[in-house]
């Protein structure tokens, strides 16, 4: 059978389409393929706890309710870290660890600079519990710094201390006892003095006694500490504390 010219052209077109059909990708996914995840339609999850800047416990003046507010604000690690972040206090959490049956770190971290103040801890970058870091930050901002300006007429540039974390027992006038110290949990700071911008150095060892401005300053911040820390011990307590204030951020209520 002879094909006319029009029929031959139609047949060629059909064959070309049939051959090219193999080059068109299949629109169906291969067997077993998983679809790409879709973008979330709601808001992304944020921090588990949020404290607005300037509204936390660290930015509130010390009063009769400070200790209770601190205990509430540091009831969980997340809440405590949020309080520090809101106040621009540098705190880097560290892993929990156990060094002995009575010594170790839980909910602790490294307290770095407080970006809202001038005073720096000396030595710096101190490992302590988050609760202690929050209490120290309240005391520094709301007591130590303003009291120095009011009584001594100069800014505090350094807060000196004798350490925080130490695996040992409680010390008294007779030496170390069998009772485990809060230092064994990094929950207590031994504060020894301050350095001022004008160059003066005020120490518990050298300036506690008397009624001069230096002694009044130290007693003022000790009295304020009693409303911030669960335990505050000074040279008035015993000879073992003749050169420092023992500041403990745990349950209890002892001020001497």
Locate each region found by the language model.
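Sec-dependent bacterial lipoprotein signal peptides
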Residues: 1-18
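Bacterial Sec signal peptide processing site at the extreme N-terminus
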Residues: 20-38
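Post-signal-peptide N-terminal segment of Sec-exported extracytoplasmic proteins
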Residues: 39-74, 79
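Active-site acidic/histidine clusters and adjacent loop/turn architecture
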Residues: 69-159
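Generic short beta-strand segments
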Residues: 162-168
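Short Pro/Gly-enriched beta-strand edge/turn motifs at strand-loop
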Residues: 169-176
């Amino acid at each position: 059978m002879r094909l006319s010219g029009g029929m031959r052209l139609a047949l060629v077109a059909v064959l070309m389409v049939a051959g090219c059909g193999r080059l068109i990708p299949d629109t169906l996914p291969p067997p077993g393929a998983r679809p790409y995840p879709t973008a979330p339609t709601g808001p992304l999850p944020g921090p588990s706890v949020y404290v607005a800047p300037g509204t936390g416990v660290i930015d509130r003046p010390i009063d009769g309710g400070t200790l209770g507010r601190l205990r509430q604000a540091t009831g969980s690690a997340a809440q405590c870290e949020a309080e520090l972040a809101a106040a621009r206090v540098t705190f880097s959490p560290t892993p929990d660890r156990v060094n002995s049956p009575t010594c170790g770190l839980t909910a602790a971290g490294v307290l770095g600079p407080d970006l809202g103040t001038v005073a720096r801890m000396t030595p710096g970058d101190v490992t302590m519990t988050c609760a202690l870091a929050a209490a120290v930050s309240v005391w520094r901002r709301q007591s130590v710094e303003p009291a120095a300006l009011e009584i001594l007429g100069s800014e505090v540039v350094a807060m000196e201390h004798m350490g925080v974390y130490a695996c040992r027992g409680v010390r008294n006038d007779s030496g170390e006892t069998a009772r485990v110290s809060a230092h064994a949990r990094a929950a207590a700071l031994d504060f020894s003095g301050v350095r001022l911008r004008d160059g003066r150095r005020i120490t518990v060892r050298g300036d506690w006694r008397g009624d001069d401005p230096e002694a009044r300053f130290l007693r003022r911040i000790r009295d304020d500490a009693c409303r911030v820390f669960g335990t505050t011990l000074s040279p008035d307590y015993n000879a073992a504390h003749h050169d420092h204030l023992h500041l403990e951020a745990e349950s209890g209520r002892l001020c001497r």
